[in-house]
């Protein structure tokens, strides 16, 4: 797992915790912030996956030429 993907997963986990604490405490602002953090983490994860895919394709094409 790349560092980018690892950090994205941490962002998602942190967001889930914030959202949960917001729900428990009745703090809608914290709950919303947690939801935003989860979505941001998911977007970062998708971008990291896309980068890994492109790197893999480039490596495969490079090996094909040899």
From Swiss-Prot:
InterPro entries: CsbD (IPR008462), YjbJ_sf (IPR036629). Gene3D superfamilies: YjbJ. It holds the Pfam family CsbD. SUPFAM superfamilies: Hypothetical protein YjbJ (SSF69047). It comes from the Bacteria. Transmembrane segments: none annotated. Belongs to the UPF0337 (CsbD) family. This is UPF0337 protein SPy_1261/M5005_Spy0972.
């Amino acid at each position: 797992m790349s560092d980018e993907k690892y950090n994205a997963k941490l962002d998602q986990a942190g967001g889930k915790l914030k959202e949960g604490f917001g729900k428990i405490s009745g703090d809608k602002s914290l709950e919303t912030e947690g939801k935003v953090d989860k979505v941001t983490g998911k977007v970062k994860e998708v971008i990291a996956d896309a980068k890994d895919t492109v790197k893999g394709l480039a490596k495969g094409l490079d090996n094909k030429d040899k």
